[in-house]
């Protein structure tokens, strides 16, 4: 099922406290909130941001961590804002992209050039106190990221692989583990069994990888640019996928009346709750 249309929808997160799903529309500078009714996202409200918003991550107290260009901000329920820091970027044409709060309590945020310049991107870890640590450099489109145990799995869009790193408080260590993707990888999430679900930009589908890197299932999406994923609902059994109108020609738009929508499906698989404590 599809509902609501985004230019560049990204970053779906389920909040088990408010029982709402949040997403961002990056270039429209807006955060959208949805209820789930019979597994379908129903739009309830939205609020504007002050910059292009790569991610809006809900915290337990009702706040959101906003990644606006290079600025990291906490937005409180009454609408007031607290600036945490500016990510110390080199270059002016950069913006935040995908981000999540890690199991270490820090914000992990990817940064890219607006024109997707090769090697201009990076991945950062940001603490609540504003400390910034660069984890990876020479990226192009830092996209999906998630953790399983002491493993960090990550994609850089033009590199058609999901790569595994060992992570600790000192940083990341590359491993030999990597899964090949059939298409441009975008957002990803682990399910409760430790298997990866990956949105594929330009492929109108989501692929399910087992622990050996084999694609064991694919889900068609009625929008070619599927962008990001999460599991939602009381039992975390509803897979939600955002999508985008961005970079789509008129002929393709005509073939996909639900282009840019947000989609949901019950696949009989459960996910895990998002990290929601920012330290």
Give residue spans per PLM region:
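Beta-rich, blade/repeat-based domains predominating
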Residues: 3-18, 48-64, 89-106, 135-152, ...
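Short loop/turn segments immediately following beta-strands, especially the blade-tip
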Residues: 37, 165-171, 267-272
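Flexible "stalk/tail and boundary" regions
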Residues: 36, 60-62, 76-77, 124-131, ...
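A short beta-strand motif characteristic of beta-propeller blades
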Residues: 1-3, 40-47, 82-89, 131-137, ...
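Conserved beta-strand positions in repeat-built beta-propeller and related beta-rich domains
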Residues: 14-16, 21-27, 59, 64-70, ...
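Hydrophobic alpha-helical segments and helix pairs
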Residues: 79-135
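Blade-level signature of beta-propeller repeat domains, shared across WD40, Kelch, NHL, RCC1
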Residues: 230-279
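A short loop-to-beta-strand structural motif that recurs across blades of beta-propeller domains
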Residues: 30-32, 71-73, 121-124, 161-163, ...
């Amino acid at each position: 099922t599809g509902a609501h249309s985004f230019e560049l929808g990204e970053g779906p997160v389920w909040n088990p406290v408010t029982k709402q799903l949040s997403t961002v529309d990056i270039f429209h500078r807006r955060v959208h909130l949805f209820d789930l009714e019979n597994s379908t996202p129903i739009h309830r409200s939205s609020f504007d941001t002050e910059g292009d918003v790569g991610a809006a991550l809900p915290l337990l107290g009702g706040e959101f961590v906003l990644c606006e260009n290079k600025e990291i901000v906490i937005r409180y329920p009454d609408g007031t804002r607290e600036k945490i820091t500016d990510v110390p970027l080199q270059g002016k044409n950069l913006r935040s992209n995908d981000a999540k709060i890690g199991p270490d309590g820090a914000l992990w945020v990817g940064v890219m050039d607006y024109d997707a310049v090769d090697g201009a991107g990076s991945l950062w870890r940001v603490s609540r106190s504003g400390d910034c640590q660069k984890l990876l450099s020479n990226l192009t489109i830092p996209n999906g990221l998630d953790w399983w145990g002491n493993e960090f799995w990550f994609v850089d869009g033009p590199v058609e692989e999901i790569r595994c790193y060992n992570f600790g408080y000192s940083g990341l260590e590359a491993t030999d583990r990597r899964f090949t993707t059939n298409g441009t990888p975008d957002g990803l999430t682990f399910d409760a069994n430790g298997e990866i679900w990956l949105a594929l930009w330009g492929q109108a589908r989501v692929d399910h990888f087992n622990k050996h890197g084999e694609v064991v299932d694919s889900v068609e999406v009625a929008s070619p640019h599927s962008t990001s994923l999460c599991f939602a609902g009381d039992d975390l059994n509803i897979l939600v996928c955002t999508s985008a109108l961005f970079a789509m020609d008129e002929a393709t738009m005509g073939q996909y009346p639900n282009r840019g929508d947000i989609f949901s499906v019950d696949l009989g698989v459960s996910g895990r709750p998002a990290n929601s404590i920012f330290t």
